[in-house]
Amino acid sequence: MPGQISAVAVLFLSLTVILHGYQIREKEFPKARGYLQYTATSAEQITTKPLLQLINQRSHITLASRFKDDYIQMAAETSAIENTAHITMKTVTPVTTKSLPPISSASYTFVRSNNAHMTASSTDDTIGSGSIAHLPVPTTRASLAIVNYITGRATQLGGQTTLPKTFFTASHKSTTNQRPTLSTNVLGTSTPTHKDRSTTSPVPLVPRPTLVTWSSPAKIGTYEVLNGSRLCIKAEMGLALIVQEKDLDSATQRYFNIDPSLTHASGKCDSQKSNLFLNFQGGSVNITFTKEENLYYISEVGAYLTISNTEKTYQGKKNTLMMFETVVGHSFKCVSEQSIQLSAQLQMKTMNIHLQAFDFEGDSFGNVNECLSDYTVVLPMVAIIVVVICVVGLSVYKIRQRHQSSAYQRI
């Protein structure tokens, strides 16, 4: 019996000592116990286990945490009210769009001071399971404050910080053991490299004139010279240059037709003289018009030609001319070929020419004056036709006369 009483007394004494020690530990280390409770609660929440059914219980824990190296300061207030879980983030500029896994009830609020100059407007997003998180772009140093959602007051945190360039992101599909992954977004400007793919097309080489041994009709080109906005020279014609080379035994002629598509027309116009310049690869032609009272004519023609295979140049000028004379305001036309001897070795030939200089009414030719050579060709043809008609008429008349005389004799 005394042994049993001693055992009971020892047990009772042990319980008293344990209880007393527990009370002393409660008084001496409340902060450590609170920190351990918070650590256990936070670890349980981060692993995203099913939320505890907390009924009629409110716990408000205010946490101010800092990242290392003074990167970010943020205010956190955690509250657990029944089964509600939400996160409110105020961001400055949305950069990346990610989905965070289910997180316990915690409210994170970023507050920027008035002296922080940001270009983008703030946006509010509530983050839950499957929602979208917009993360801020760190462009300036902004002060952060702790916001108490119960009292509605904000406590300013001292110091300024620059938001880091590393953010926490998570995939859309979350599991119970999934943890946020680090996604580093390197912000900065980079100059893109553009490859210059523009190519300079080579300038086509126009061959120099090549002479041929046969004559062929030259192409008809239209050449105009303007005096300001008014037309002062207009010419429609075909041109050919003839090279004459004499040997000891014989003389040969070779031909070069001027191509209008490869010829550039220019010139100058005065009240009494006007010039038409025709430039092409390997040569040129210069025609001068002179005006006297109410008449005008071609007074000078010059040309030069460089042959491609021999690199030999032929040139000549005729300045005592009075060709294609016509009335001022009229145009001159000559269908037949006309030849001008410029030098002993160079000759110019015109064909189907129609030109006018000086006074124009609009952009069209005036009344046409034709050259005599055209008349010399036309008049013989007309005479031949008239003679043929007369012969046919006389023949018909004689035949009819014979028929009539034979009819009278029968009667």
Curated annotation (Swiss-Prot):
InterPro entries: Lamp2-like_luminal (IPR048528), Lysosome-assoc_membr_glycop (IPR002000)
Source organism (scientific name): Mus musculus
PROSITE patterns xref list: LAMP_3 (PS51407)
Gene name of the encoded protein: Lamp3
GO biological process: adaptive immune response; lipid metabolic process; surfactant homeostasis
Cellular compartments annotated: Cell surface; Lysosome membrane; Cytoplasmic vesicle membrane; Early endosome membrane
Highest taxon in the source lineage: Eukaryota
Keyword Glycoprotein tagged: yes
Keywords noted in UniProt: Adaptive immunity, Cytoplasmic vesicle, Disulfide bond, Endosome, Glycoprotein, Immunity, Lysosome, Membrane, Signal, Transmembrane, Transmembrane helix
Self-association state and partner proteins as the record states: Monomer. Interacts with FURIN.
Name of the protein in its database record: Lysosome-associated membrane glycoprotein 3
Coiled coil: none
